[in-house]
Curated annotation (Swiss-Prot):
One of its GO terms (cellular component) is membrane. The gene is pbpE. It comes from the Bacteria. This is Penicillin-binding protein 4*. Keywords: Cell shape, Cell wall biogenesis/degradation, Hydrolase, Membrane, Peptidoglycan synthesis, Sporulation. Probably involved in peptidoglycan modification during cortex synthesis. Belongs to the beta-lactamase family. It comes from Bacillus subtilis (strain 168). GO terms for molecular function: hydrolase activity.
Length: 451
C-alpha cells in the first residue's frame, strides 16, 4: 500500500517538476516513515543553483507553531500562565484585558502592525520587535474589538508572544526557541534567521522569488516596489523568520507525538478550538489551524505566505500522516491548494488529478491617459476608504490600512493585481469613473466615488 502511494506521489510531483510547474521541496510521510521526499527547481534562479532536500526556506507564518510552543513550554514550567495579562510582562501596555491566551488564539483584537508600518515607517530602517511594542505603547491605535469578543488573525499578537518569551526566559527569542525546541527535536538545520538584518552566507539557502508583471520575469522581492517591505520588516520575529528544511519539520512533527517533548495536557490545550465570549467556537488553537474530517480524523496545520515563499505543514494526527510543502517561487494560491489536495488524496488512497498551473498574468497595452479618469477617492460597501492614484503612467489602488498595489490592465476598464486573485473593473461616467467593482475569490463589492 505504501509503495503504491509512493509511486503516485512520484508521478504527481515529477509531472509538475518536468513541466516547471512546481519550484520547491515536498515531504510526505505515514506512520513515521517518509514515503516521498524530493525537490524541484532552483534555490537561486540567477545562478541556476538547484534546490535540494536540505535547502533552507523562510517559513513565514509556519513559524507561529514554534512561537506558541515556546509559550507552552514556559507555562509547563510555571514561569507564566495563559491567563496572564500582557501588562504583567509589558508594564503600561495600553490594551486592557488582553491575555497570553488571547494572543495565542488571535482573539486579542489588537491593531495590525503591518498596516501602520506600511504608512508610517522609514523604509531605510529595519524594524525589530521593540518597534512594534513602541507602536502599541505610543500611537494610540484603536483595537478591532474587545478581547475574546471576536477572532482576527494577528501577526501583532505573535510578535508580542516572542517579546514575552524573552522577558519570561531571560534569553533571546532565537536562543530560547533553539535550545527548547529545535535541539531537543533534532532540528539541527533550523534557525531564527533575519536575512537582511543579520546576513550570513548559507550555501543551501533557498531564495524566494516573486513575479514582476512588467518584465514578465521572476525577481527577488527586494527589487519590486510592492514587495520590498520584506527589507524593512526583516528584523521582526515571532510571527515569522523561522527558517527550516523539510526533514527538520518532519522531526518536529514526530516529536509532537512524544509526551516528553510536550505533555498530553498541553497538546490538548494547543489543539482545542477557541471559544468566544458569545459561545461561538473558532477552529484555531495555540498556533495551529484545526479541522475534523469524517474520513481523515483530526487535522492540525499551519500555512505561511511571504513574498517569494509559500509553506504548509499538515498533520493528520489520528492517522499519523504528514504533508510538508515548501516553495520559494510565487504561485497562484488556488493552484497550490490543488497540489496539496492531490497529495492528500494520494495519502488517503483516493483518486486525484494532476493540477494545471495557470499562465503567468500579462498586462494589456492601453493608452495610459485614461488613468486620469479613474483617479479619486472611493468608499467600499463596508465603509472602508480606497484611493486610486497614478504615478509614472502606472495606476495604483490603496485600501485603507493596506499596502498600495499596482493595477495592471487586462482591458481599458478592467485591471488585475499581481499575485492575487483580485480584479477591479471601473464604471465610467461622462468625465470620470463613477465607481468600481472589486472582484475577489468569487465575491464582488462595489466602491462608489466620493471625490
Amino acid at each position: 500500500m505504501k509503495q503504491n502511494k509512493r509511486k503516485h506521489l512520484q508521478t504527481l510531483f515529477e509531472t509538475l517538476g518536468e513541466k516547471h510547474q512546481f519550484n520547491g521541496t515536498v515531504l510526505a510521510a505515514e506512520g513515521g516513515d517518509i514515503l516521498y521526499h524530493h525537490s524541484f527547481g532552483y534555490a537561486e534562479m540567477t545562478e541556476k543553483r538547484p534546490l535540494k532536500t536540505n535547502s533552507l526556506f523562510e517559513l513565514a507564518s509556519l513559524s507561529k507553531p514554534f512561537t506558541a510552543l515556546g509559550i507552552i513550554l514556559l507555562e509547563e514550567k510555571g514561569i507564566l500562565g495563559y491567563e496572564d495579562k500582557v501588562d504583567r510582562w509589558l508594564p503600561g501596555f495600553p490594551y486592557q484585558g488582553v491575555t497570553i491566551r488571547h494572543l495565542l488564539n488571535h482573539t486579542s483584537g489588537l491593531p495590525d502592525y503591518m498596516g501602520w508600518f506600511f504608512a508610517n515607517w522609514d523604509s531605510h530602517k529595519i524594524a525589530v520587535n521593540q518597534d512594534i511594542v513602541d507602536m502599541l505603547m505610543n500611537e494610540g491605535l484603536s483595537g478591532y474589538f474587545e478581547p475574546n469578543e471576536g477572532w482576527m488573525y494577528s501577526n501583532t499578537g505573535y510578535v508580542l508572544l516572542a517579546v514575552i518569551i524573552e522577558k519570561a526566559s531571560g534569553m533571546s527569542y532565537a536562543d530560547f526557541i533553539k535550545t527548547s525546541i529545535f535541539l531537543p527535536a533534532g532540528m539541527n538545520e533550523t534557525r531564527v534567521y533575519n536575512r537582511r538584518l543579520s546576513p550570513e552566507r548559507i550555501d543551501h539557502y533557498a531564495y524566494g522569488y516573486v513575479y514582476d508583471v512588467h518584465s514578465e520575469t521572476y525577481v527577488l522581492p527586494d527589487e519590486l516596489e510592492e514587495t520590498n517591505y520584506v527589507v524593512y520588516l526583516d528584523g521582526i520575529q515571532g510571527d515569522g523568520t523561522v527558517n527550516s528544511v523539510t526533514s527538520d519539520l518532519f522531526r518536529f512533527d514526530q516529536a509532537l507525538y512524544q509526551d516528553d517533548f510536550i505533555s498530553k495536557a498541553s497538546k490538548e490545550s494547543a489543539f482545542s478550538p477557541v471559544r468566544l465570549n458569545n459561545g461561538e467556537t473558532i477552529d484555531y488553537g495555540f498556533g495551529w489551524v484545526l479541522q475534523n474530517s469524517p474520513e481523515k480524523g483530526r487535522i492540525v496545520s499551519h500555512s505561511g505566505g511571504w513574498p517569494g515563499y509559500s509553506t504548509m505543514m499538515i498533520r493528520y494526527i489520528d492517522h499519523r500522516k504528514t504533508l510538508i510543502y515548501l516553495s520559494n517561487k510565487e504561485e497562484d494560491t488556488e493552484y497550490e491548494q490543488a497540489i496539496l489536495k492531490a497529495a492528500e488524496h494520494i495519502l488517503f488512497g483516493q483518486p486525484y488529478d494532476v493540477p494545471e498551473r495557470p499562465a503567468d498574468k500579462k498586462k494589456k497595452a492601453i493608452d495610459t491617459a485614461i488613468y486620469s479618469r479613474y483617479v479619486g477617492s472611493y468608499l467600499l460597501q463596508d465603509g472602508t476608504a480606497a484611493q486610486v492614484t497614478t504615478e509614472n503612467e502606472r495606476l495604483y489602488l490603496e485600501i485603507a490600512g493596506q499596502l498600495r498595489l499596482e493595477l495592471f490592465p487586462s482591458s481599458e476598464t478592467r485591471f488585475f493585481l499581481r499575485a492575487l486573485s483580485v480584479e477591479v473593473e471601473f464604471t465610467l461616467g461622462e468625465d470620470a469613473a463613477k465607481s468600481f467593482i472589486l472582484y475577489e475569490d468569487g465575491s464582488e463589492e462595489e466602491a462608489v466615488r466620493t471625490k
